[in-house]
Curated annotation (Swiss-Prot):
It comes from the Eukaryota. InterPro entries: DNA_rep_checkpnt_protein, Sld2. This is DNA replication regulator SLD2. Residues 52-131, 162-224, 285-437, 451-470 are annotated as: Disordered. It comes from Phaeosphaeria nodorum (strain SN15 / ATCC MYA-4574 / FGSC 10173) (Glume blotch fungus). The lineage of its organism: Eukaryota, Fungi, Dikarya, Ascomycota, Pezizomycotina. It holds the Pfam family Drc1-Sld2. Belongs to the SLD2 family. GO terms for biological process: DNA replication initiation; double-strand break repair via break-induced replication; mitotic DNA replication preinitiation complex assembly. GO terms for molecular function: DNA replication origin binding; single-stranded DNA binding. Residues 418-431 have a biased composition (Basic and acidic residues).
């Protein structure tokens, strides 16, 4: 059989087998035919065998011949035509196996992630910076062109004595006319002027001359981490997406969508109820039926709140300024509440009540007929406490020097004035009057030295840290 006949027969067998497989799948609920199903049908199994044989022949005929199967005669003729080669050198080591181009082409390319996507360098050096500002590729280049070396006086022209060319009067500018009118000094020669300009400190730049600064001047600017305001780049609002809140963040007090929908539904229901009530009233009015009075809904409160209403919180601040002039608020017991006052520091010094010592008039002093001893005794009795009182005062001073005021204000002893009535009843002696006593400035009780007789004494006794030596 020729190649065309085998191909036609192969195509016929393949069409028959495809048709049988399709019918088998339709009869068996889409199940494909297996080996057992093919062996059970002898006709189909024979067609499979014949189809495999024909396919094998076609592939064998179309396969190319390998170069190793060439005839020896052709090889000999080719060797005769070529230039004879030198004798091969003997290799001491085992030669490596050479791979053919076909094998290299057929090798699979490893599909690792390194070859799928481009990657940068694995190690990056330090970023070049100057005063905190990252330098780019062109910032590190010198300001001038590096192709030509600059000399110090390379731009200076030769100072050759020559007749200066006459400048045209049309080229004279307004500035030159003004300077000429002001009487400027004699201009320097051109050679000297350009030569000295290389060593003169440059003048301050004017506002009109200032242009866009070059990248080399960025190094003198304020570093980025010390700037107070960083200029942000332009924001492209076209492709902005609505920011979605993170699920782990706590939501605010805003109403959710479901709550808003429920509120809208409730408003609609209330509106429909009102419309239905209005329609019902209109129908009843047309029919002549009187409307029953509406019942007011009273809240069913079993137990009222025992706490007082505090609209501004527990501190009970005044709601308005008018409330300040009102009466004080009453507590739950009916009594006015105590005004809260911030407590300060306690007393740091001892409290002393200084009572005034009234001086008797001259008329009263003229009636005093007591002896000097009795008068002194009365005055001492007024200013000096008894022995027990002195002991009590000393003991209290030893316990605490900063106790309450009650413990340090000794009760004055009530001394009855003797014989005051007898003096009034006695007749006045004629002609003789007692001279008025002059009271000293130190007669006040606070300036009188008291002779306190106690076991320890006013100074704490002889013992202790501050005791006197004997």
């Amino acid at each position: 059989m020729s190649i065309t006949e085998t191909e036609q027969r192969c195509n016929e067998l393949r069409n028959d087998l495809k048709l049988w497989e399709k019918n088998f799948a339709a009869q068996n609920d889409g199940r494909k035919a297996g080996r057992d199903d093919i062996k059970a049908n002898e006709e189909i199994s024979n067609k499979y065998k014949e189809y495999n044989k024909l396919r094998g022949k076609l592939t064998a005929q179309s396969a190319p011949q390998t170069p190793s199967k060439r005839t020896a005669s052709r090889k000999a003729t080719r060797d005769a035509e070529r230039t004879p080669k030198a004798a091969p050198k003997y290799q001491t080591s085992t030669p490596l196996k050479r791979k053919r181009a076909e094998e290299l082409a057929s090798e699979p390319i490893p599909q690792s992630p390194e070859f799928l996507s481009p990657q940068g360098p694995s190690v990056i050096g330090p970023t070049p910076q100057r005063d905190g500002i990252v330098l780019g590729l062109f910032d590190m280049l010198p300001a001038g062109t590096p192709s030509k070396r600059r000399a110090v006086l390379g731009d200076v022209e030769l100072n050759i004595l020559q007749t200066p060319s006459r400048r045209s009067q049309e080229a004279a500018s307004e500035t030159s006319l003004e300077s000429r009118a002001r009487g400027e000094r004699t201009p320097v020669s051109v050679g000297k002027r350009f030569m000295l300009n290389q060593f003169v400190t440059p003048k301050k730049r004017k506002m009109e001359e200032e242009g866009t600064p070059s990248s080399t001047t960025r190094g003198l600017a304020t570093p980025a981490f010390l700037r107070r305001g960083n200029l942000l780049g332009p924001i492209d609002e076209a492709d902005e997406t609505t920011p979605r809140p993170a699920p782990w963040k706590r939501r605010g007090l805003g109403r959710s969508l479901s709550a808003m929908i429920q509120a809208m539904k409730k408003d609609e229901d209330d509106k429909l109820d009102e419309e239905a009530d209005i329609m019902r009233e209109m129908e009843m009015e047309e029919a002549g039926i009187s409307m029953p009075p509406k019942k007011l809904r009273v809240p069913q409160i079993l137990v009222e709140d025992s706490q007082a209403a505090m609209p501004l919180g527990p501190d009970r601040g005044l709601e308005t300024e008018e409330d300040e002039d009102e009466e004080p608020e009453l507590g739950p017991d009916g009594k006015p509440r105590r005004v809260w006052k911030k407590k300060g520091l306690k007393r740091q010094t001892r409290r002393v009540i200084m009572r005034p010592n009234f001086i008797k008039s001259k008329l009263e002093s003229a009636l005093q007929l007591h002896d000097d001893s009795e008068d002194d005794q009365d005055k001492v009795a007024e200013t000096q406490a008894t022995g027990h009182a002195a002991d009590d005062v000393d003991s209290e001073d030893d316990i605490s020097d900063y106790a309450s005021d009650v413990s340090h204000t000794p009760k004055q002893r009530k001394v009855q004035k003797k014989k005051t009535e007898e003096v009034k009843d006695q007749p006045k002696e004629g002609g003789v009057k007692t001279a008025a006593r002059k009271i000293k400035a130190t007669a006040h009780a606070n300036f009188r030295r008291l002779k306190i007789k106690s076991s320890t004494g006013a100074k704490g006794g002889a013992k202790g840290k501050f005791g006197r030596r004997r």
